[in-house]
From Swiss-Prot:
UniProt-listed NCBIfam families: PRK01683.1
Family: Belongs to the methyltransferase superfamily. Tam family.
Record protein name field: Trans-aconitate 2-methyltransferase
Gene Ontology CC terms, in alphabetical order: cytoplasm
Pfam families attached to this UniProt entry: Methyltransf_12
Alphabetical list of Gene3D superfamilies matching this protein: S-adenosyl-L-methionine-dependent methyltransferases, Vaccinia Virus protein VP39
InterPro entries listed in its UniProt record: Methyltransf_12, SAM-dependent_MTases_sf, Trans-aconitate_MeTrfase, Trans_acon_MeTrfase_C
First-tier enzyme category under EC: transferase
Superkingdom: Bacteria
Catalysis: reaction(s): trans-aconitate + S-adenosyl-L-methionine = (E)-3-(methoxycarbonyl)pent-2-enedioate + S-adenosyl-L-homocysteine
Keyword ATP-binding belongs to the record: no
Length: 257
């Protein structure tokens, strides 16, 4: 799946707010390196660097376009390309921070357990994931894909990502390994300029696998059909803007010191 840093940062303030909220719940760290998993263009990495300047910091991402943007943003910081599915967590980390990446990995709880095992005593695993598959913004992606005009391109392919496990599942799997685990949902309400702004937002994330699956000459038609559905699902408010509802799941697990 391809990514575009330029598309992603069109809504950088809105995308970075959950990272700020997650980082605010991370306690002081012991000595040891910190890792920003799925660092994207480096917006979350910058927050970690400002909060924990004394911990060596490494950004990890699978997409070279994102890494190029991150390296330009934070000159001299270490960034590495890796696919988290096959990535082996280095032992002795003080922090594994992951903002909006694990929702793409169907069996990510297994990896979360390995991350906790790799933490030093007192280290923290901090995770945020969009939990918005039941929102119109995402339901309409699949609905559009199932239309006769586009269905052939998606035949035999699973495009829609797997729903997140329940909060209880995360607690049950992680609690035996840590001193404290907190799991919570936050729902953000983003006022955006128009329904087209919602389309632009999801073009940077949720729509990517759908667009990648389509032939290049069909993407414009798919986007037009999807945008029309979005306009009906998100009517304008009195000032002309629309309100994007965006639920997110947060996990902070702290290992015993």
């Amino acid at each position: 799946m391809s990514w575009s840093a330029a598309q992603y940062v069109k809504f950088e303030d809105e995308r970075t707010r959950p990272a700020r909220d997650l980082l605010a719940q991370v306690p002081d760290l012991p000595a040891g390196p910190a890792f920003d998993l799925g660092c994207g263009p480096g917006n979350s990495t910058q927050l970690i660097l400002e909060r924990f300047p004394n911990n060596p910091l490494v950004g990890i991402d699978s997409d070279e376009n994102m890494l190029e943007a991150a390296r330009k943003r934070l000159l001299g910081l270490r960034f590495e390309r890796a696919d988290l599915i096959g990535w082996t967590p280095p032992q002795g980390a003080a922090l594994f921070f992951a903002n909006a990446v694990f929702q793409w990995l169907p069996k990510h709880i297994d990896l979360l357990e390995r991350l906790v095992d790799a933490l030093v005593p007192g280290g923290t695993l901090a995770v945020q994931m969009p939990d918005n598959l039941d929102e119109p913004s995402h339901l309409l992606m699949q609905e559009t894909a199932e239309e006769r005009a586009f269905a052939a391109a998606f035949s035999g392919r699973t495009i829609r990502r797997v729903p997140l496990p329940s909060p209880r599942t995360y607690v049950e799997r992680l609690a035996p390994k840590v001193a404290r685990v907190d799991v919570w949902h936050t729902t953000y309400y983003h006022p955006l300029a128009s329904a087209n702004a919602i389309v632009e937002w999801v073009k940077g994330t949720g729509l990517r696998p759908y667009l990648d699956a389509l032939p290049a000459n069909r993407r414009k038609d798919y986007l037009a059909a999807y945008a029309e559905k979005i306009r009906r699902a998100y009517p304008a408010m009195g000032d002309g803007r629309v309100l994007l509802r965006f639920p997110r799941l947060f996990i902070v697990a702290v290992k015993a010191a």
